[in-house]
Structures are given as structure tokens and as C-alpha cells.
Amino acid sequence: MRSNALVLAVVCSLLAVGLGTIGSTPVFALESPAVQSGNVTEAEIETETETGTKNHSAIIKVYPNLPVPQNRGEYVVVTLAQPGNWTLTDGVSTVSLPRNHTGPIAVTRDPHLTQNITRYPVYETASRFRLSQDGETLTLKRDGKMVDKIAYNRATEGDRWHRNASQQWIPEGLTLRETVNTGPATVETFVLPDTPAQPIEPITTATDRVHIGAYTFESWTAAKALVEAHDRGANVSVLVDGNPVGGVSEQQKSVLDTLVAEGVTVHVLGGDRSRFRFHHPKYAIADDNAVVLTENWKPAGTGGKESRGWGVRIENNRTANELYTVYRHDTGWKDTVSWETYRTQIDTTEQPVAAGEFETAHRAKKHTADQVSVLTAPGNAEDAVVKMLRSAEDEVLIMQPQLASPQQRMVRAAVAAAKRGVDVKILLSDAWYSNEENSAIAAHMNRQADAGNYPLAVRVDEPNGRYGKIHAKGLVVDNTTIVGSLNWNDNSARENREVAVQIESAEVATYYRSVFAADWQTDKHDERTVRYVEGGVLILIGLIAIGTIAYAHRSIIFAE
């Protein structure tokens, strides 16, 4: 059993990867002439389209399967752009809505219960309007004519259907966050494997608090810094994913056991009711510093022993506090348990430990940023990336381990920028488990760019001894940069917990532009080589992708 687990761990590891504020909300009966607007942000009442974001009348939320008897308090939220003769129907029952109301409204049979679980103004219907747990179609009409229609499938208990670009179900216990602007800041930029001391350095001086949000935590160097911070009197804790691809490594078990023995709190997020497919961020809060990374807390990542990664240290207490708010949310529900409890329920796997040695080509550098924004997934990160790409004027640089599909929403936005005349470059990993698929997608996108005569180039990386493989998830658009854990696939954007920062700074963009340019260089080919892969090779690539690595790809593309 151990040998099988070892094989699976090695292969998978290499191939991998709301409810509103509770409070008092006005309740209005059917006869009420108007309903006052609640405290709802634009992001919650907008629907993404391919051409932009528009306010319009729509069904925006459905909560049909509450974890209470008879689903009392169930509701559907609609937003109305103008007064009128509005109705909502499921094909069996029809609800008349307030004629003079504009804005969002939660329609319910049980207003006094609903007002405690939503921030929206609540509207009591006198009809026997009930939402189906098994799924149904809801239609919003004005003067008897359809304005919007949605169909939802079977609802898991506690999940809410949320109207956004992905029209996703939001698990119980998860509050979708808005993008939070935390103001100007001093930002230190660095890359890995060049400067492995940088992610750890803020921890070594912390005296008040250190909290780490991680996918995995296997770094003895970071663990030592955490224990020393704890000994200095700081409040120290770690949150890791409970079911990483390949399993929990023996090294991680040893590291976490040591942390707990030394008094550090370790949380594990997972289980059948997990709010996320993977808890996948890589960040640290150290006093008033925030560290946000593309790399995992292990030798191959923060240890500088293998992967090309990007990272930033942000000297700004508002950024640190916002990350701590995310951390408290993620550690504060029933899908999170202590490491002491969790470790008794799992078997560990032997996994290889990276031990590469690389020269320092890029040193850390401090800059001034005009604005820093904290992005999270699920919720706002994908929208922020798409919005940024839509605003591109001159240049887009994308570094990713893999692209799931040319049809992924962020990828489509990058292609659309190129079609507007923006110079777009995409650099993908050459890791053995993704090289063939990345080569195929690069060839496809490059051929499309050639045929359409727009400035897009996609290349599979050639590290040439500078690092082991690309693991960075970085984006530069003109003078704005995004650094974080977000992979460009639907599961990362919509199912995983991801954390990134968006930095408005010409200096930061210039730093990563220089790193990207150096990594883009190759000794073997010019940038168009991958455009002319023979059809037979592409067929072979497709067969390999479908056959030998299909399972691993499905698992890992979501969690690298």
C-alpha cells in the first residue's frame, strides 16, 4: 500500500496542482408601495457579458435548500432596474413584485427569518411561492413579457445559487468577498528561486502576529521562523489544505507535528462539507506586513530549490488586516479542524523533496505602489483579471504553469486584447507532465493569431538551468501587476480558495517585465517556432493528453 501511495503521490504532485452580514433588514408586506434599497454593492447586482458589465433587471440569487426544517426562510433575490408591473414565476405560482421599487429585493414567504440571513431588503409574498430543492426554472417578467430567466439544478443543503459570470453555487459557510483596495504602499518584489530569504524575512522580525494561509506547508526554514516568532510572544498559526493532490507528505506531517509541539496553532481545512475544492493560497501576515506568493511553502517553492515563482512583500497594515479577515473567515467554520485531530485520520505518503541549486539573477527590490488591492477566489479574482485585460492598451504579459483551455474566460479576454492590437505574450511551463498539452495549446493559439494577424505569442518555457520549471501565476498589464495563487482555469477561479494582489505601480510592472523578458529568452528557437508544429505531432500530443495523462491532468490542473 505504501509503494502504491508513493507512486501516486510522486505523479500527482508533479502533475498538480453570501450570505450577507447578519442584521436587521426592513421587511415589507405585499401591500407596501415601495421597498427601500439595502446595502448591496454593484458587484452583487451585475452580470458579466462578453462586452462588459451592465446593470439590468435580473434574478441574481437563489437560496432554495436551507439547513432548517421545511426550508423556512428560503428566498430568491431579483434586482429591478425600473418601476413597473413586475412578476416572478416558477411556472406554477406567480409573485407580484412592488410596482415602484428599483434595486435588489429578497422575495420570501418567511420575512422574519430571511431578514436574519441576508443583507437585502426583504419582501413578503402572500402567495404559496416555494423554491424547489431539485431545481427549476424561474422567470422574471415585466408587463407579462420575459425579462430574465434562470434554471438551476439540484441544490445541496446550504448552497446558494449566485448570478455571476460562472452562475455558480456558493457553499454554506462561504461569503464571497469584494475586491478590497488597501491604498498606497511600499512593495518589495522578488522572484524564486533567486531570493528564498524574502518570504521568510518578515516572519523573523514579527512580534505581534504571524498567520500563514497555505496549500501545503513543508518548509523547515519557515517552520523555524514561526517557532521563533511564537517564542517572542507573537500569535502564530497556520492553515493548510486537508486533501492536497498526492496526499499529505511525510515531511509535512513532521513539520506540522513540530509546530504543534512548539505551541504553534495549525488548522486544516477539508472534508465532505469543505467550502473549497482546494485551499490553495500562499500568503503570510507578519505584524503589518503581507506576503503574497505564487509558490507553496516547501523547498521547491519558497525554499528556492526548483520553481520559478513571483512574490511580493507589502508594507501596509490595511493589506495585512484584509488578509487576516480572509484568514479568520477561512478558519472559522466547521470544515476547519485542528492538525492534532486531522492527523489521526490520514495516511501520509513519501514524496520527493526538491534540492536544486540556482544562481541569483534577479534581486529583491522595493518600490512605491499607488494602489494595492486584495483579490480572492471564489468571488472577485477572475472578474478582476478580466477587467484588467479589457483595459489593456499596450502590453500584456502572462506567466502560468498551464492554460486549461483557449475558451477559459481569462484566456478569451487576453486574446480579445490582442485582437485590439495589444501586444500579448504568454509563457507556459515545460514541466514533463504539462509540456505536451502546453505545446498543443500554444500551437493552436499561435496559429489562430497568425491567421487573424494579431500580436499574440504563446511559448513553452525553456529554463536552461535558471530554475527547474515555471510555477508562477503572474500577470502584467501596462503598469498594473497581479501576483498570487490563481491558476487560469475554472476550478481555480470558482472552486478553490485563491489569494492574489493587484498592484498599480509602474515600478513593480517594470520589475516583473524584466523578469518575464529574461525568462522569455531561449537559445534554441525564435518566438514563432511553436507556431509551425506539424499536424501529425499535434495528433500525437492530443492522444497522449487524452490517454496517458488524462486523469492526472484533471486532478492537477486545479491545484498546482
Give residue ranges: language-model regions:
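Short, aromatic-rich amphipathic segments at membrane interfaces
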Residues: Q502, A506-E534
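A structural motif detector for short, solvent-exposed N-terminal "entry" segments of globular domains
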Residues: T25-T94, R130-S132
